[in-house]
Amino acid sequence: MRGGWGRFPPKSREVAAISGKHKPKLGQNFLVSEAACRSIVEALGNLGARTVVEIGPGKGAITELLANRAERLIAIELDRELAPRLRERFARRETVTVIEDDVLRVDLSALARPGEKLLVVGNLPYYMTSEILLHLIRHEAAIERAVVMVQREVADRVAAGPGSRDYGLLSVTAQLHARVEKLLTLPPGAFSPPPEVYSTVLRWTMHSRTDELGVDPTRFTGFLRSCFAQKRKTLGNNLRAAKYEPAAIAGAMQSAGVAAGVRAEELSLEALAALWRTLEDRS
């Protein structure tokens, strides 16, 4: 999607007028594009009977649109100045709850009603994007879909395929747990203050592949960390550094059809899973 990056959604000028200084240490770059706000909300799908969790609502440009559509909205804001102002702004909306906290400390699973899966949305602070994405993965059983704004370079890493320069641990971890789509990229001018980089909206549809690939989530995640520990090293060297037996590594790689000098960045998630299963059988 391109063009049409206006300033504010309808009625959100009230929210945009919420006072509060920009805090660089919190990674605050407030989204002020009408078209982008609408695209993000629409990417979540039908909100009629759903609970939506917004991470980092800031001054509320997206919050306003969500409050008009979702049956239940929970906004998690770390900024001690903005959180009470948002709470005051939406005080008459019984369907809106503002939580003042770091999202990494919030048990997202506890926010879902019995039998319900959450929709998550947020303009994520760049300095903690990876940590928040991993936090979503930890609560994947309670989340159906997440639409998040991240730095373009991070989006490229998340969506990258094997053999590309962006492919790495974040790529395989994300793709193990979700179907990832890049929806649109925004210029710095879509934000206030403008960041120094472009930003991309990602849609994560939670879809764990651990059963399909025949892997144990915890042990396989540790294996992936070992595989990608040092990008310049071969896969075999990284696994030896992780205390796997050299003979077991060589045998497993041969059985899985993996070349001896290959690097982890060259292998698909499926190939890495096959290698892990073979190593597990030999241990």
Curated annotation (Swiss-Prot):
Protein localization: Cytoplasm
UniProt GO cellular component terms: cytosol
Keywords attached to this entry: Cytoplasm, Methyltransferase, RNA-binding, rRNA processing, S-adenosyl-L-methionine, Transferase
Record InterPro entries: KsgA/Erm, rRNA_Ade_diMease-like_C, rRNA_Ade_Mease_Trfase_CS, rRNA_Ade_methylase_Trfase_N, rRNA_adenine_dimethylase, SAM-dependent_MTases_sf
Keyword Transmembrane helix among UniProt keywords: no
GO MF entry, a single one: 16S rRNA (adenine(1518)-N(6)/adenine(1519)-N(6))-dimethyltransferase activity
Entry superkingdom: Bacteria
Binding site for S-adenosyl-L-methionine: N29, L31, G56, E77, D102, N123
PROSITE patterns: RRNA_A_DIMETH (PS01131), SAM_RNA_A_N6_MT (PS51689)
Enzyme Commission code(s) on record: 2.1.1.182
Family, similarity comment: Belongs to the class I-like SAM-binding methyltransferase superfamily. rRNA adenine N(6)-methyltransferase family. RsmA subfamily.
Its job: Specifically dimethylates two adjacent adenosines (A1518 and A1519) in the loop of a conserved hairpin near the 3'-end of 16S rRNA in the 30S particle. May play a critical role in biogenesis of 30S subunits.
HAMAP family (alphabetical): 16SrRNA_methyltr_A
Cited NCBIfam families: ksgA
Protein name: Ribosomal RNA small subunit methyltransferase A
Organism this protein belongs to: Acidobacterium capsulatum (strain ATCC 51196 / DSM 11244 / BCRC 80197 / JCM 7670 / NBRC 15755 / NCIMB 13165 / 161)
Encoding gene, per UniProt annotation: rsmA
